[in-house]
A protein has these predicted regions:
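Phosphate/NTP-binding elements of NTP-utilizing enzymes
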Residues: 2-239
Length: 239
């Protein structure tokens, strides 16, 4: 069932977008797979699109995180990226920005950039966390941003024409989706394939589960694994 559209303001976007310029981000240490397009230029444009789509005002450190993830995805680095931030510093908001931006835009870019053909039928994101409420936090934020008036305006653009196909799940008409799963020791989570995986509260996620079940889900796609968390009390795959 299509999601009911919200009324739009006549004078443009509902949320004012703020933040610094992506040209201020240090990209000297980024080197992905050889692609035929200017990866940094495209990453910058994707970031600009995401700000309009979501209306999320990112701080400079959040922009650097989002930029690094997006660059890794479109260059098929196959990287494992670690995001270590304190509590209440905007981890979930940053991940929601990345999820919404890539699920909406990458299938459209795949039609005009041959290197991104892998995403022509949708961009697949897996979201994992040790407890269900931790999954819900990021999942719900991503859904909220995609049902905003800002997003409705962007999604209805003739060059995109993307819509949510559910009121409770992030499944888009372009084939993209966000799947949220609990990553506890008792979980059975094999047999899925993703282009991007995000592990929330990575410091509390079981080492064996990450190695045996989660990491192989990216092997066929050259996808990016993002481990997000804060400091823990034991040393594991996160630290």
């Amino acid at each position: 069932m299509p999601v009911k559209k919200k009324p739009l303001k006549e004078d443009g976007f509902v949320f004012e977008t703020t933040g610094g310029s992506v040209t201020d981000i240090d990209t000297s240490d980024m080197a992905g797979r050889s692609v035929s397009f200017d990866a940094h230029f495209i990453t910058g444009k994707i970031m600009d699109f995401g700000k309009v789509l979501t209306g999320i005002p990112l701080y400079s450190y959040q922009e650097e995180i989002a930029y690094r993830i997006i660059y890794s995805v479109i260059t098929f680095e196959g990287s494992v990226l670690t995001v270590l931030l304190s509590r209440q510093s905007g981890k979930s908001e940053t991940m929601a920005f990345v999820i919404d931006t890539l699920t909406v835009l990458l299938p459209a870019l795949a039609k005009i950039i041959p290197d991104l053909e892998q995403f022509s039928n949708g961009f697949r994101v897996g979201l994992f966390a040790p407890q269900s409420d931790q999954v819900v936090t990021t999942y719900s934020r991503a859904m909220t941003r995609l049902t905003s008036a800002n997003a409705e305006m962007v999604l209805s653009d003739p060059d995109l024409l993307v819509s949510l196909e559910s009121e409770v799940r992030l499944n888009l008409s372009n084939g993209s989706f966000l799947a949220g799963q609990v990553a506890s020791k008792q979980s059975k989570i094999e047999s899925k394939t993703y282009d991007l995986i995000i592990i929330e509260e990575a410091q509390d996620t079981d080492d064996f589960l990450v190695t045996k079940s989660i990491e192989p889900m990216l092997s066929a796609t050259g996808g990016t694994l993002v481990k997000v968390g804060t400091t823990g009390i034991t040393k594991n795959h996160f630290w």
